């Protein structure tokens, strides 16, 4: 295989999606082919782009028949040599200082929009909402992935009937997500010996795992990657805020005061770390009586609307209580799949439409 073939392939991969007007061929410092192992050394324009460049290289060259392994290496970006300037003849007013970011947020290659689904507390149905929202987006014709980032309580394997499923990797050590119901799915639960195995990780371990899930997974081209976050405002949320370019967050709550008190903290946290809050989903909003078809607001009515108005948020939709949701979830069948004509499924499809419109308006 000629070096020129590699260079030509790398010319087609650019860094324009991270605001840098260069292609990968311009960053190459060395190329070697020993047997069927291709080694390429890059000098990135700045630090923090290594995972993105590595993923783009594998996408560009991974299908070459002569190559069985690609080893991507990096040298540190060369520091700019300061230019000596003459002292000004008269004192000048310095230009206003702009605050430099303390971290670099990176895009996941091939993924247009990353939507984080969070909540202030557990028990509000966040994971069920994230799972059915992902399925609903897929049914609208979007290419969708679902990442179970709820590392302390991964429930996606149960919700999709994937208990005991194990992840595999390709020849380039990229994680291959599991596919079901038209989604590409990845969960920490796929990597545990059993569903009873606890995850006892500190912040650095969480950061490493999430980074691997996002940037070392073969997601392909996705319109949406839905992330099911753990409840609260802990290490996972901070890691994402510092390292990943999210389109925004969706918060899930129930109408109870105790849930609303905690979801306010979640909204404040997202805003504190400059993650846009795209809207609120009200779960368990009401119960439809089978006999008279009337709506009964078991946990009260109007509280979520008051909260949304106070915080300047959009209500994406309200989901009724339905015993079928829990029953089918335990069997690994999202309600949008098992009962597409139910009020709950219709609510999820409506929310997916509204969310996609919110995202498009934000982008435009």
Swiss-Prot record:
Binding site for ATP: 120-127
Family: Belongs to the Mrp/NBP35 ATP-binding proteins family.
InterPro entries xrefs: Mrp-like_CS, Mrp/NBP35_ATP-bd, NUBPL-like, P-loop_NTPase, YlxH/NBP35
Protein name: Iron-sulfur cluster carrier protein
Keyword Mitochondrion included in the entry's annotation: no
Domain of life: Bacteria
Self-association and partners: Homodimer.
Keyword Hydrolase: yes
Biased composition regions of type Low complexity, renumbered to the chain: 83-92
Region described as Disordered: 83-102
Single GO term (MF): ATP hydrolysis activity
Biological process terms in GO annotation: iron-sulfur cluster assembly
Function according to Swiss-Prot or TrEMBL: Binds and transfers iron-sulfur (Fe-S) clusters to target apoproteins. Can hydrolyze ATP.
Organism: Aquifex aeolicus (strain VF5)
Keywords: ATP-binding, Hydrolase, Iron, Iron-sulfur, Metal-binding, Nucleotide-binding
